[in-house]
Amino acid sequence: MRREGTMRLHRTFLLRVYLKESAVITYPASKKIYCQGKIFPTIRVGMREIQLTNGDSLTLYDTSGPYSDPNISIKSPQGLPRLREPWIKVRPRKTQLAFAKEGVITPEMEYAAIRENQKRELKKNTDQERERRLQGNSLSARIPNPITPEFIRNEIACGRAILPANINHPESEPMIIGRHFLVKVNANIGNSSLTSSVEEEVEKLIWALRWGADTVMDLSTGKKIKEIRETILRHSPVPIGTVPLYEALEKVDGDVKALTWEIFRDTLISQAEQGVDYFTIHAGVLNRFIPLTQKRVTGIVSRGGSLMAKWCLLHREENFLYTHFTEICEIMRAYDVSFSLGDGLRPGSIADANDEAQFAELKIQGELNRIAWKYGVQVMNEGPGHIPLNLIEENMTKQLAYCREAPFYTLGPLTTDIAPGYDHIGSAIGAAFIAWQGCALLCYVTPKEHLGLPNKQDVKEGLIAYKIAAHAADLAKGHPAARQRDDLLSQARFEFRWHDQFNLALDAETARLFHDETLPKESAKHAHFCSLCGPKFCAYKTSHEVRDTLQKVT
């Protein structure tokens, strides 16, 4: 079967969604700047620049897209500017993987390389002893300085990285996912049969962008699934992923037995036409693996995995996502949609971690990777789940071996089961560890995990926890663009530049709020102490006095 995708670059309908004032994203002491491409001079890569009170500045990777540019007017029905449309129109219909294998650097590849470097080449470290001492341990990863478009091309060609960019999502700003790059974070949004509207989901999308979501998955399972997805795509500068099985099941009113390959196929094509950048496909849940879950404490906890297991048992047939995998590859190749091969048998409790069912599916994922690559389709692998700290390394080691170093995309993992309401913390611990080991994309967990549908505050708290985890891993790996923010914040802290401390923080508002709870006056922003130690016991203040004394003595 050969399928030609259709580019929907001129849409004939409008969306009845109107952006609120909250759609404008602002950051304190920051401005939007753009970096120009060299291979493709028309490329303008948006970044965030923080201005410090001592005249220094910091350039940051920015996921907010046009929402943080005051010079761009976003008209709600039409959505965002179609950044990639000119590039797509003038080139052959091929995937990023196909171009990469042919040795071709695309505009998307240069764009992603510029983002990764964050203008790092303009900042030189002069303390060589400190650089040697703090040099990261990237384990088996190779992180060049600077990251070049050619390096990105080669990583994609080898299957070690993906650049998710559907031809029908020209609004997206290219980004790269792989263990040799900055660790990325995914945020899940989407309605359920009980809550949420189109407007609320768009608001959640923009809110997730504000707090640093590198990708977003629309996991809607309620009403207006297609309308919500269309609206999100037209308003998203980051790649959007879905689980097509959810919409396919909605078409048969939730009757798993009534679900067919044909219904799923048509759903897949429809979503690819809309512009979805990556699909979670649970093709590794095979008939022979289902009995392996019988003795588990929590059975099959993946929604897609449990649905496909039920379908297999009802029909006494093999998983149609597996038997029709090559046809799925052909559809995805036509639109340059990336695979996110679902971990339908991931462990949902510490008791089930690293069991036979989990790793049996992972081996099948590796086999499916090779088929996808043969068809020129980019692929990453989804992983657990609930894993104690001592078993996390085994997950990463097996994934690299079975899946030939394809990007790993994990949900956490949660390192304990005792923290309902705080699972974002318990899972961020595991996320930081597995990201250091080589995981490329972390799916955030919110405080509402296992309890309910996340609201805006939950989205923020989940993202903050996971941006901390990702950054901690980048520091440990020695990513060349990682440590500068830490150093500048530490310098500001030692020099009592309170405003700079706040503005360099991941969450400036909360940092300022906590400080002002006890010392709200503006004069306190220039004081050489905070309310924790007071003026007499501040270690930094005393340290300055020690330095001054040493200078006089020497």
Curated annotation (Swiss-Prot):
Positions that bind [4Fe-4S] cluster: C530, C533, C538
BP-aspect Gene Ontology terms: thiamine biosynthetic process; thiamine diphosphate biosynthetic process
Secretion signal, residue range per the UniProt entry: none
Cofactor note text: Binds 1 [4Fe-4S] cluster per subunit. The cluster is coordinated with 3 cysteines and an exchangeable S-adenosyl-L-methionine.
Major enzyme class: lyase
Keyword Ribosomal protein: no
GO molecular function ontology, one term from the record: carbon-carbon lyase activity
Record keyword 4Fe-4S present: yes
Pfam family, one: ThiC_Rad_SAM
Highest taxon listed in the record's lineage: Bacteria
Pathway it works in: Cofactor biosynthesis; thiamine diphosphate biosynthesis
Cofactor(s) demanded: [4Fe-4S] cluster
EC number: 4.1.99.17
Record keywords, A-Z: 4Fe-4S, Iron, Iron-sulfur, Lyase, Metal-binding, S-adenosyl-L-methionine, Thiamine biosynthesis, Zinc
InterPro entries found in the cross-reference section: ThiC, ThiC-associated_dom, ThiC/Bza_core_dom, ThiC/BzaA/B
Residues given in the record as Zn(2+) binding sites: H386, H450
One GO location term (cellular component): cytosol
Residues that bind substrate: N188, M217, Y246, H282, S302, R303, G304, D343, G344, L345, R346, E382, Y409
Catalyses which reaction(s): 5-amino-1-(5-phospho-beta-D-ribosyl)imidazole + S-adenosyl-L-methionine = 4-amino-2-methyl-5-(phosphooxymethyl)pyrimidine + CO + 5'-deoxyadenosine + formate + L-methionine + 3 H(+)
Function statement: Catalyzes the synthesis of the hydroxymethylpyrimidine phosphate (HMP-P) moiety of thiamine from aminoimidazole ribotide (AIR) in a radical S-adenosyl-L-methionine (SAM)-dependent reaction.
Subunit structure: Homodimer.
NCBIfam families: PRK09284.1, PRK13352.1, thiC
Similarity field: Belongs to the ThiC family.
Protein name: Phosphomethylpyrimidine synthase
Organism the protein comes from: Coxiella burnetii (strain Dugway 5J108-111)
Taxonomic lineage: Bacteria, Pseudomonadati, Pseudomonadota, Gammaproteobacteria, Legionellales
